[in-house]
Amino acid sequence: MSNNVIEKVTELVQPITDRHNFELVEVEFVKEGQGWFLRVYIDKVGGINIEECAMVSDELSEILDAQDPDPIPQAYFLEVSSPGAERPLKTKEDLTRSIGEYIHISLYASINKQKVFEGYLKSFENDEIVLDYLDKTRHKELKVTYDQVAFARLAIKI
């Protein structure tokens, strides 16, 4: 059921985000404790603000309330927000847009006994990711294919 809700909400919210030139990053429908949460993550170049999140929330809420039959029969909380500083990089377009940024990647299989890397994304071409990372005090370059990456997100360098 969760996937059906996500598909339907994505279908309903995409025209709203398109109209405002926002990017629809992700839609989640999850149960936490006793409650269900419908989370819509949006962004734009330069970052999204709280007023823009509220505007999308109001528009989506109105559209969801008008649906018959109701795509979400149980009670839920609607949250519209930014994906945050450590935004997930879910698509090839996300990676291309993040060239030069500090990122975190987790691989499906270890390379030299290591699965997790953080560094600067130097390039992403022909499905090859090139990451400049520190190994103790030395800069190293990691080259992996897009298919080797289990998860990627922006990271905050400490």
UniProtKB/Swiss-Prot annotation:
Q: Which locations, inside or outside the cell, does it occupy?
A: Cytoplasm
Gene3D superfamilies reported for this sequence: Ribosome maturation factor RimP, C-terminal domain, RimP-like superfamily, N-terminal
Q: Does this UniProt record's set of keywords contain Cytoplasm?
A: yes
Q: Name one GO biological process term.
A: translation
InterPro entries named in the record? Ribosome_maturation_RimP (IPR003728), RimP_C (IPR028998), RimP_C_sf (IPR036847), RimP_N (IPR028989), RimP_N_sf (IPR035956)
| Lineage: superkingdom | Bacteria
A GO cellular-component term linked to this record: cytosol
- State whether keyword Cytoplasm applies: yes
Predominant subcellular localization, coarse grouping: cytoplasm
Q: Which UniProt keywords apply?
A: Cytoplasm, Ribosome biogenesis
Would you identify the family this protein belongs to, as annotated? Answer: Belongs to the RimP family.
HAMAP family per UniProt: RimP
General function of this protein: Required for maturation of 30S ribosomal subunits.
Q: Please give the name of this protein.
A: Ribosome maturation factor RimP
